[in-house]
Amino acid sequence: DPDQPKVHPVGQIKMVKPLGVDHQKETGLLLVTNANPRYSFQIFSGTQSSQWLDYLDDQFQFVESLPKGLQDLLTVRLYFHDYAWEQEKRWNERFSNIALDLGKKNINELIAKSRLYVATYNAGTYLQSFTMNIPTVIFWNSKHWEIRDAAIPYFDELKRVGIFHETPESAAFHVSEVWDDIDGWWKSKPVRDVLEQFKSQYCDIDCDLTGNIEAELRAESNKF
């Protein structure tokens, strides 16, 4: 990012690898959710305080927009820190048929049983799913999760191939459209090309990580 001269890409530091799962053969649909403190204490691009209730409503709208058959296959992973929002209670009051994970289980156990991974907030969650080659759909309200100008072209490309959505309805429709042939979508050339471009910019693992870090540190030290 030319507007961030002090930030230098070196690669993805948290190394994750594919689980060796043929996701097309799995039956689960995994929705990974987030929560935030009830009171604002810092300013960043994301839901603040009671905006989380709008975020939760988007999650409910996503589920309601899915066909009944997919709702029955869905597991919702709640954020491990509840912040007194009573996530589990709210979900159970809205949906009696949805499986909930309280965020305590190793997420890889859920991923291994899932055909598709749905990320709902802008953090490392989808970067890791990309590098693990898990079929992934992302959606969030762009008024809550704003991205910097330099990143917009990359997300526009994700949107073009059906990975990124700005409404829960659009995401749910796409999930239902590709569900029966995930590989036909996820392994298609347009999707692979966009993913490779995005990963090379934001979550590159095919690089000399330690060498890149050393080179950047030496370059900085030589300035003094």
Which residues are covered by each model-predicted region?
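Soluble or luminal CAZymes and related metallo-dependent hydrolases
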Residues: 51-59, 170, 205-209
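Conserved catalytic-core segment of nucleotide-activated headgroup transferases in glycan assembly
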Residues: 3-90
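C-terminal alpha-helical cap of glycosyltransferases
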Residues: 200-224
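Donor nucleotide-activated moiety binding/catalytic core segment of transferases
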Residues: 12-14, 72-127, 131-132, 142-143
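Catalytic binding pocket for nucleotide-activated donors in carbohydrate/polymer assembly enzymes
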Residues: 2-11, 92-95, 121-203
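Hydrophobic beta-strand segments of well-ordered beta-sheets in folded domains
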Residues: 26-31, 71-76, 98, 116, ...
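Short, surface-exposed amphipathic charged segments that create phosphate/polyanion-binding patches used
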Residues: 20-30, 112-120, 178-182
